[in-house]
Amino acid sequence: MAHQPVGDSQTITTSATSARVQFAVQTDTVRVVPISQNVHVAIGTTATATTSDYFVPAGTPATLNLGRASSMGIAGVTTGAATVIDLSEGMGNPFKVDDVLTISGITGETGFNTTAKVVSIQEARTIGYAQFGAKLTIDHDSRGLFAGDAVVTAAEARRTLTVAARTDSGSGKLYVQQVQISGDQ
């Protein structure tokens, strides 16, 4: 089985309390390797690891499923106490309420690119059975920004997750890397 690393590797310093790292999901699998201590691993939008979560023995790599790797181009933004994101038309909508998103690639106005923003409203724009685009409302206060200056040509919304880990006792490290897997598993 071969692994193709995707994105940056991250390190969590582990102890008997939960520690976490957040990342934009780019593939459906994450590989974790605990060093020096056994760990319990939790994955979710705002995960906190407990001793009842997935157990990984020290020095043993584990590959865990992240679910879908969702991203979508952004067609526009509307400012407010919560920011409304217009998704590209004709593409559907891979996101749902309570997903956590990273917004990137917006130029022309600083402050629209954000991390860890929760989707609070999902609004489909349909005519008959055809979906022509969708709107998402995220918990980002953009009242001080001017949407008219926002250039969304390369803008993207991407699903974000958290990996959390803790030990039973003592401290160590957990290496976290998103991977693509090929070959026999």
Task: Outline where the language-model segments fall.
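Short, intrinsically disordered N-terminal pre-domain segments
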Residues: 1-22, 169-185
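Intrinsically disordered, low-complexity Pro/Gly/Ser/Thr-rich segments with frequent PxxP/GP/PP motifs
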Residues: 6, 10-12, 49-68
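Surface-exposed ligand/attachment interfaces on beta-rich extracellular proteins
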Residues: 7-26, 47-50, 77-88, 108-110
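Extended extracellular/luminal ectodomain segments enriched in beta-structured repeat modules
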Residues: 24-29, 94
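Asparagine-centered strand-capping/turn motif at beta-strand->loop junctions
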Residues: 30-36, 165-167
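Short, surface-exposed beta-strand/strand-loop-strand elements in extracellular ectodomains
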Residues: 35-53, 177
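Small/polar beta-strand repeat architecture
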Residues: 68-97, 102-176, 183-185
